[in-house]
From Swiss-Prot:
Domain of life: Eukaryota
Presence of the UniProt keyword Acetylation in the record: no
PROSITE patterns: ANTENNAPEDIA (PS00032), HOMEOBOX_1 (PS00027), HOMEOBOX_2 (PS50071)
Region (Disordered): 290-321
Listed Basic residues bias regions: 297-321
Keywords: Developmental protein, DNA-binding, Homeobox, Nucleus, Transcription, Transcription regulation
Subcellular location: Nucleus
Similarity comment text for this entry: Belongs to the Antp homeobox family.
Name the UniProt record assigns to this protein: Homeobox protein Hox-C8a
Amino acid sequence: MSSYFVNPLFSKYKGGESLEPTYYDCRFPQSVARSHTLVYGPGGAAPGFQHPSHHVQDFFHHGTTGISNPGYQQNPCALACHGDATKFYGYEALPRQTLYGTQQDASLAQYPDCKSSSSSNPGEGQGHLNQNSSPSLMFPWMRPHGQNNTVISYIFSPMFLCVRAYVRVCVCMSVFVCVLKCCLSARVSLTYKMKLVREHDGAHRTCTAGCCCSAAHVHTGLDGRRNGRQTYSRYQTLELEKEFLFNPYLTRKRRIEVSHALSLTERQVKIWFQNRRMKWKKENNKTSFRVRGERLKPRKRATRTVKGKRRKRKKRKRKRRPRSDFMVLFMVIWLKGRKKEWPHKQMKSHKESESVNFMTILSFFFCREENRNPTNVAVINRQKKSSTFILT
C-alpha cells in the first residue's frame, strides 16, 4: 500500500523514515509519531489514551470497525506537509487508492487542506471542512475559474485589440504599396514599348536566310530618340544599292517588302533612299536621273504657292531683248528702199537729206522707249525747226 497515509505508520520501524519517499512527505507531529496516540473528545479536552497498533488499520478503515462514538468529536490530526507544493500536482497521474478499501465516494479522499479527518458519518466530515478556514495550499484544480483565463483576458483587452488592429493596418498598407509599385512599373514599361513600336511604324523584325542577324539596331535613349547614326551591314547596303539602281523611288508596298527582307523598318528604308538620292545629286550635279536608259525627271511635290507664282509671272512685263546687228542692217536697208516716199520739198539739198535720213535711223534705234512709237513726231534737227517728218 503506497499511500502517504500508510508511510508514517512504518516510521517506528525505520527510524522515523518512510518506506517510499515521494516529492512530498506528510507526517504526524513528533508527539503523535512517538506515542501513537489519538486525541478524542470535544475540542480536544477529553483525556488521551493509548491506541494499540493493531487498531490503526481500523482507525483508517472507518466503515468496518473502529471507534464510533457520537458523543465524542474527533479532533483532526495535524499533518506536516513537506516538499514542493507545485510537484504535488504530479500525484494526480498516480492511481488513487481509497482509504476504505472500495471506491465508494471520491469526495471522501480529502486532499485539499492536507488534513486527515475521519468521522463515522460522511456528512459530518463535509460540514467540518466547510467550517474550517481556507486552505493554505492552493492546487491548480482548487483555483477559481477566472484565474486560469488570464491569457484570454489579456488577448481581449482593449490595448491588445488596438495594437493588433494597428499591426493589421500597417501590413495591409505595405502590401498595397508594393502592389501599386509593381502596377506602375508594369504600366511604364508597357507605354515605353508601345512608343518604340509606334516609332518603328509597326514593322516586324524578321530574319531571313540571307539576312545578317547582327544587323544594326536602333539605339534609343530614355526619351525615345535615336542616339548616334544608324549603321547598316554589308548585305543590307548591297541590297539597297541594287534596289536604288533599279528604281530610286519606292512605293509603299515595295518599301514594306524591302524592310521585311532586310530586317529593317519602313522608316529606315525611306531615310536611306532619301540620303542616297541627295548623294547622287551631289555627285552628278544634275536634277534628273537615268533609269533603264530613259530620262526621268525627279518628282515635284505640288504646293499651294505654285499657282500663285505662275500668276505673278504672267502679270510681269517681259523685258525686250536687245536687237542684234543683223536687225539693224535690215532696218537700214528697208529705210533706204522707202526713201522716195519721204518729203523732200522742205529740204535744201540732197546731201542734207542724206544726213537727215541717217539721223532718223539713229534716233529710231537709240532713243527712249516712248520715242519709238511711229505715231510720234520726231524732231530731226532742232536747229532747223522746219525739217520735220512723220514716220509711217
